[in-house]
Amino acid sequence: LKMFSNATSIETIAHSLNVSHSSVHNWIKTNLLETIEMDNKIYVKTSSFLDFCHNHLGKNKLNKYANKSLKDTYNHKELTLKYLKKLESSSLLENLGSYYEEELSNTTRNLEGIYYTPNTIVERLFTLPKDFDVSCATFCDPCCGSGNFIMHALKLGFKVENIYGYDIDAFAIALTKERIKERYGIDCPNILQKDFLNLEHTPQFDCIFTNPPWGKKYHKNQKEIFKRRFNLIQSLDSASLFFMASLNCLKENAHLGLLLPESCLNIDVFSEMREIALTFQIKKLMDFNKPFKTLITRAVGLVLTKTPNKTPNNDEKISCFYQDNEFKRSPYSFSNNPKKIFNIHCSSKENEVLDHLFSIPHMTLKDNAHFALGIVTGNNKEKLYSKQERNTIPIFSGSDISKDSLKTPSKFISTDLSQCQQVAPLSLYKAREKIVYKFISSKLVFFCDTKQRLFLNSANMFVLKENFPIQSYTLKELLNSDLMQFIFEKLFRTHKILRKDLECLPLFTQFINDKFDEKTYLECLGIEKLDSKHFAIKS
């Protein structure tokens, strides 16, 4: 990393503020940082960098993450030492883990992905077949945290000498060992302060149940090593990495259970992980709502046996638990979904409708439209006006969009967009017809714009390619229909309308003439509308 007296490298700034290189480039683009060229390379003027730290950090949403990291001076080592001392005198060992977790700074939790598992979840997730013999079986928790999975394994009858646990946190290891000693009066030598992803050998276990780190941050070179080690192409999130490492450490026909973020079930980046899981016998998929106080993310459970799922039409059903409902779903019903989505909120009957629809020839928006993001100003307070002034034009946000109209404009922007952080090709904004839609929404809301309006990044848009078989307005009507909302909800159930999800939706344009008629469309598809939210296959 280079730093001259008058210039600082982009790498140094990114490292010191704990942000990506692209964030620094965005600050340069929006003139928050001034550059200088040295040795045929671009640097940031040190005076400009110091001025940026003094005048902008903490005052701008653009660098909120960097500011948070910079201001968070919490010393994790000091906290560990503090709790190791408490461990010597505390009698409430189980509670000590909760107190420790609460005192961890949000930055440390987010960087390391540390969220300890409540006992109620451990007991529901960690179940074994009635004929499973624990007397000689080995158990491992690769990220043992406060030891809840290990304590449950002992409760189920696993022997202490057959229990293994790993964690990189010294306090987690000490607490788990102490809990075992307090409860059973025995030292457990196999609880080790090691990184499970970097073990020198590959031990083989009969049973692994764990809550791996969620969204732990890894350096680029670490990701490259993991990509080669686990033979992954895209799923390089910590949850995927621990999934692969756990599979590698399981004997044939052994049992695996993971507590995961809900995104593992439906987001594109985890499709590789889902595809691998489907090659084995998945036993349970479980929804645990939002069990962690500081996280808005839902938690889900995945339980499988490392037994090859030899045929895609395997009749052995997967038990899906969602809220108060239990469904039985075939592995095929998931492998048949776009991106192998595990839509466990979708009942067997509802999924039959999806399977029926996807079996009918259809087209999608993939490769049939030019997509564009709304404009990212970089600083809305500075670049947006509440009333129209000279050389400004209206700009709309996602909240202004409804299915048939736009609200009266309440924001205006300079006609010169060169100072904005991100602008798509103007030809897309200025297209004769474009379809715009709310980005942050669980409901599909599309509007056909024929007046070349501008939109902020809370709205996205696309322009149909020339040979698309129906008109933009007609497609807008189809996308706003109850059937499309049903398909979207039963597949994705997200609060963001993502391009890759839209590109999966089936479009049966062969059943549409000049106008979209829902009744005719459903008849052609052999689908009956029970009400606005429920559909069934016609008998």
Describe the residue ranges of each PLM region.
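Signature of N6-adenine DNA methyltransferases within the class I
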Residues: 120-121, 144, 148-150, 160, ...
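Conserved SAM-binding strand-loop segment of SAM-dependent methyltransferases
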Residues: 185-196
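Polybasic, glycine- and aromatic-enriched phosphate-binding surface used to engage nucleic acids
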Residues: 21, 26, 353-539
